[in-house]
Amino acid sequence: GSDGFFVAGRKAGIVLVTGSLTATFIGSSVVIGMVGIGYSMGLPGVWWLLVGAIGLVILGLFLAKKVRRVGVYTLPELLEKQYGSNAKLLASLVIVASWIAICAAQILAAGNVLHALISSWDIRALMVICAAVFVIYTVLGGQYSIIRTDFLQLIILVVGLLVTLGLVMNDVGGIRGLKDSLSQGFFSFPVSESFGWYNLVVFLILTGSVYVVGPDIYSRLFCARDERVARNSAFSAALAAIPIAFIVVLIGMGARALFPSISPSDQVFPTIIQQ
């Protein structure tokens, strides 16, 4: 039925919902982007995900239980119940327009990662394959297929990031070698000369707010077994974001020590994979 396809039967437990939430905001484009930020500015780059963790805590404290309680399928439906059909239409148009770009970025990032591994293939062909895989498992399995695939992708991603970090740190000479190779500004936290309090506030407003009202986030909460699972999953995903943020940025910092002249920054992660 519709519940099964759109919201996984509203039966997902905290492990699946947390895993799916985390995989949702730790996609290939975020990893590539954050590695590049770590390469460019160092530790302050973790705020790209840490503001998301703050947003998820706000979501868990004030909204997650209410969102799950309504029992709708989409964010526009939720807005319609609160503000009428005009709000639903406007939200639908905004989501479609913005998510064309977001999906394109994810496909581009996935294609870049695969191209780093299979350089003999045309990158456009790899992007088409990635897009086809996304569409096929979504159409065939619905949301339950998505959240299970998200969970598997998260495990693979975290293992891959840990292995990559270990290899990079080994080549650099550990944290001590990293400190010897980079200027002190790379280790300045929470702010630095290149990333001040103003930048942090802008990050919090523009990026953190996405985690409070994002349709991709809400679609996972709609799948939760009950209100308690929805709330606790938001908290758990926020907690998971913290170590992942530091792992990804440290990879970027290690890459800066090993390959100081990579440009543009979105080529840092593919370069690491190729090496």
Segment roles from a protein language model:
Residues 3-21:
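Loop-to-helix transition at the N-terminal end of transmembrane alpha-helices
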Residues 2, 43, 85, 123, ...:
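Membrane-helix interface/capping residues of multi-pass secondary transporters
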Residues 34, 63, 75, 106, ...:
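Hydrophobic/aromatic residues in alpha-helical transmembrane segments
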Residues 23, 46-139, 206-210:
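Helix-loop-helix module between adjacent transmembrane segments
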Residues 21-30, 53-56, 96-104, 156-159, ...:
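Membrane-embedded alpha-helical segments of transport systems
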Residues 9, 93-97, 149, 236-237:
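Hydrophobic alpha-helical segments of secondary membrane carriers
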Residues 9-10, 16, 33-45, 80, ...:
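Loop-to-helix junctions at membrane interfaces in multi-pass transport proteins
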